[in-house]
């Protein structure tokens, strides 16, 4: 699914919550990549996932315990679900090369800057090579 959107209407939040719900409730072994102009900009995603887990009704969890969110070196892990979210920056397309991802969110892509020897499209190609075609 591709969503082209205007800024500040909530589309990114909807995408992130949908991805978080899939990972927290529906699927195991379902990894995601979130890439922004800067890696620090993807901190918003971490906050959204944390908020979703904090406020998700406990009685709706099918497992014995609600999954916890652990973070380490740009990777968020949902304990008990075998799902990860890889946070990446558009300036480093090789950072997620080889990741087995099912979900991708390219955020603020219009603001991705070209750097010496790297074009934003290099990042898009690197990320989409990580998505298995079913």
Feature locations, PLM:
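Phosphate/NTP-binding elements of NTP-utilizing enzymes
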Residues: 1-134
